[in-house]
Curated annotation (Swiss-Prot):
PANTHER family hit by this protein: POTASSIUM VOLTAGE-GATED CHANNEL SUBFAMILY KQT MEMBER 1, POTASSIUM VOLTAGE-GATED CHANNEL SUBFAMILY KQT MEMBER 4
Pfam family, one: KCNQ_channel
Source lineage: Eukaryota, Metazoa, Chordata, Craniata, Vertebrata
UniProt keyword list: Calmodulin-binding, Cell membrane, Coiled coil, Cytoplasmic vesicle, Endoplasmic reticulum, Endosome, Glycoprotein, Ion channel, Ion transport, Membrane, Phosphoprotein, Potassium, Potassium channel, Potassium transport, Transmembrane, Transmembrane helix, Transport, Ubl conjugation, Voltage-gated channel
Species of provenance: Rattus norvegicus (Rat)
Mechanisms controlling activity: PIP2 molecule is essential to activate KCNQ channels by inducing the coupling of the voltage-sensing domain (VSD) and the pore-forming domain (PD). Upon channel activation, PIP2 disrupts the VSD-calmodulin/CALM interactions, causing the release of CALM from the VSD which triggers the opening of the gate. Calcium potentiates KCNQ1 channel current through calcium-bound CALM. Calcium-bound CALM competes with PIP2 to stabilize the channel open state.
Compartment annotation: Cell membrane; Cytoplasmic vesicle membrane; Early endosome; Membrane raft
Transmembrane intervals: 121-142, 154-176, 193-218, 227-242, 261-283, 323-348
UniProt intramembrane annotation: 300-320
Protein name per Swiss-Prot or TrEMBL: Potassium voltage-gated channel subfamily KQT member 1
Gene Ontology terms describing biological process: action potential; adrenergic receptor signaling pathway; atrial cardiac muscle cell action potential; auditory receptor cell development; cardiac conduction; cardiac muscle contraction; cellular response to cAMP; cellular response to epinephrine stimulus
Spans within the Cytoplasmic topological domain: 1-120, 177-192, 243-260, 349-669
Modified residues (Phosphoserine): 27, 407, 409
Length: 669
């Protein structure tokens, strides 16, 4: 292949190599199947752009990247496909053009922005729409006042045009973005989305506004009396603010929870209303007021008076005239008004309980990530003792295949591209974008000095020159001789670190460091979980203490039951009959009773043995007919007393008393 060939010729040559190895799809397929590939290189013999071969590591025919391009020599077939050389990540062919966002991704973002607003941007947008709708409603009200009709009508006309265009466009965009969800895909899915109540309201508002603008004459809104009835449709725009219906769901949940109390109070209040109104009608149906007119001429008038009274409005158009009617009305007011006021208190307490429940739910939701982090860190601490390779794979950076362009003066890219590339690398290594608490660091190691790469990397050369400024600051040989030691220290400090790409490259100090980091992360997660578990209200503290007290009492009862089962009941309050029954059991009390019985029997036998030994001693000393009392008297007269004669009956003799023969008084003298 000619080194000065044009890019089309080079492309045809690449296609030829691809056909030799198999069918290909794009440059990526060729890179996987061909043992070497061609890259763009500037600064050729003609000053134009040529294609330079990039061969795998160790392949023959590889030249330095900045040298003139040479003809490629195919690598041996047994080497197989290998990743190409990474020259400069700033000029990757994937970053030369903007990444194309998928259609479903754009639909999802638009749908979340319009239908699921979160964040300050969504808040600003929807709040601005609410203000515009409110201003339009105010001008619609002012257009009915003769004093402001001229100003409000003209302004309202142009505001209606803007709002119709805006809401119509937004309706179409909402209908289009709903396709990101599976149940709204296709025509039937869009129709299902359009059948939602809030979508029907939006469509009615847009159509009603278009009818008002089209039928109006001389540029004035609501010019004819036939269109005045459509004005109330403008109020439906206020429903546009709460598209999710959170307000109505909250009200419905409160009413549903307290439905029994509400039904009871309303039922009793309604009964009090109809009975009291009927009694007032009977008392006031013939009464005439000062103007000579009967105020309670029908039962409907009495019901109207009752409704106005129990709702504490009191228009004063109907007033009882007789004392009987006034008495009935006073009793009715005290009784019925209290029942009609109860629903307000019930709903208020229900809303307060609902808010408290949501706060507790939020407080509980904060514990979920903390608990998950604690479980994760605890498991990682446990897995660190396992020598399996999967434990350490998260710390190994996968070798990313980079496709680069050769350029003598590459332009630095924006930081956005760097962030996107970093995000892609993290995603390839199994990291989720939301994992911000415990980031897994990638481990680097010093490359061995005796290992030399088979290729020349411009990126490594540029980084080494950039990170070693002392090589560029050398002025005289004398400076080199006097500062050789300092230069060696600088070069040692500027050693390039290579990322670890395989588990086998991890050493013992790497694993020990990982274990220490995991243990520190475990303690941090434990502390955060304990902080998240702290109660935020006094009621929660009381509830927690009561629950703990209940658990403590249950454990104490269980311990007492086990003690009674093992030791037995206290013998102080047990009668003898129950003790005899308990002797056959295996409790500690029964065993102690049996041991005490055995000790008593042994004591009795030892007493018998002691008496027998005394008799033997007496036989050895003075004969069988010697009396102890006479021996005591005789011994007392001689001035010596034999101590063996005063041994207690329940005491045992010593070993010397049993073995050493006693000497008489004559022998002792």
């Amino acid at each position: 292949m000619d080194t000065a060939s044009s890019p089309p010729n080079a492309e045809r040559k690449r296609a030829g190599w691809g056909r030799l190895l198999g069918a290909r799809r794009g440059s990526a397929g060729l890179a996987k199947k061909c043992p070497f590939s061609l890259e763009l290189a500037e600064g050729g013999p003609t000053g134009g752009t040529v294609y330079a071969p990039i061969a795998p590591t160790g392949a023959p025919g590889l030249a330095p990247p900045m040298s003139p391009p040479v003809s490629p020599v195919p690598a041996p077939a047994d080497l197989g496909p290998r990743p190409r050389v990474s020259l400069d990540p700033r000029v990757s062919i994937y970053s030369t053009r903007r990444p194309l966002l998928a259609r479903t991704h754009i639909q999802g973002r638009v749908y979340n922005f319009l239908e699921r607003p979160t964040g300050w941007k969504c808040f600003v947008y929807h709040f601005t729409v609410f203000l515009i709708v409110l201003v339009c409603l105010i001008f619609s009200v002012l257009s009915t006042i003769e004093q402001y009709a001229a100003l409000a009508t003209g302004t309202l006309f142009w505001m209606e045009i803007v709002l119709v265009v805006f809401f119509g466009t937004e309706y179409v965009v909402r209908l289009w973005s709903a396709g990101c969800r599976s149940k709204y895909v296709g025509i039937w899915g869009r129709l299902r989305f359009a059948r939602k109540p809030i979508s029907i309201i939006d469509l009615i508002v847009v159509v009603a506004s278009m009818v008002v603008l089209c039928v109006g004459s001389k540029g004035q809104v609501f010019a004819t009396s036939a269109i005045r009835g459509i004005r109330f449709l403008q109020i439906l725009r206020m429903l546009h603010v709460d598209r999710q219906g959170g307000t109505w769901r909250l009200l419905g949940s409160v009413v549903f929870i307290h439905r029994q109390e509400l039904i009871t109070t309303l039922y009793i209040g309604f009964l009090g209303l109809i009975f009291s109104s009927y009694f007032v009608y009977l008392a006031e149906k013939d009464a005439v007021n000062e103007s000579g007119r009967i105020e309670f001429g029908s039962y409907a008038d009495a019901l109207w008076w009752g409704v106005v009274t129990v709702t504490t409005i009191g228009y004063g158009d109907k007033v009882p005239q007789t004392w009987v009617g006034k008495t009935i009305a006073s009793c009715f007011s005290v009784f019925a008004i209290s029942f009609f006021a109860l629903p307000a208190g019930i709903l208020g307490s229900g809303f307060a309980l609902k808010v408290q429940q949501k706060q507790r739910q939020k407080h509980f939701n904060r514990q979920i990530p903390a608990a998950a982090s604690l479980i994760q860190t605890a498991w990682r601490c446990y897995a660190a003792e396992n020598p399996d390779s999967s434990t350490w794979k998260i710390y190994v950076r996968k070798p990313a295949r980079s496709h680069t362009l050769l350029s003598p003066s590459p332009k630095p890219k924006k930081s956005v591209m760097v962030k996107k590339k970093k995000f892609k690398l993290d995603k390839d290594n199994g990291l989720s974008p939301g994992e911000k608490i415990f980031n897994v660091p990638h481990i680097t190691c010093d490359p061995p000095e005796d290992r030399r790469p088979d290729h020349f990397s411009i990126d490594g050369y540029d980084s080494s020159v950039r990170k070693s400024p002392t090589l560029l600051e050398v002025s005289t040989p004398h400076f080199l001789r006097t500062n050789s030691f300092a230069e060696d220290l600088d070069l040692e400090g500027e050693t390039l670190l290579t990322p670890i790409t395989h588990v086998s490259q991890l050493r013992d100090h790497h694993r020990a460091t990982i274990k220490v980091i995991r243990r520190m992360q475990y303690f941090v997660a434990k502390k955060k979980f304990q902080q998240a578990r702290k109660p935020y209200d006094v009621r929660d503290v009381i509830e927690q203490y009561s629950q703990g007290h209940l658990n403590l009492m249950v454990r104490i009862k269980e311990l007492q039951r086990r003690l009674d089962q093992s030791i037995g009941k206290p013998s102080l309050f047990i009668p003898i009959s129950e003790k005899s029954k308990d002797r056959g059991s295996n409790t500690i009390g029964a065993r102690l009773n049996r041991v005490e019985d055995k000790v008593t029997q042994l004591d009795q036998r030892l007493v018998i043995i002691t008496d027998m030994l005394h008799q033997l001693l007496s036989l050895q000393q003075g004969g069988p007919t010697c009396n102890n009392r006479s021996q005591v008297v005789a011994s007392d007269e001689r001035g010596s007393i034999n101590p063996e004669l005063f041994l207690p009956s329940n005491s045992l003799p010593t070993y010397e008393q049993l073995t050493v023969p006693q000497t008489g008084p004559d022998e002792g003298s």
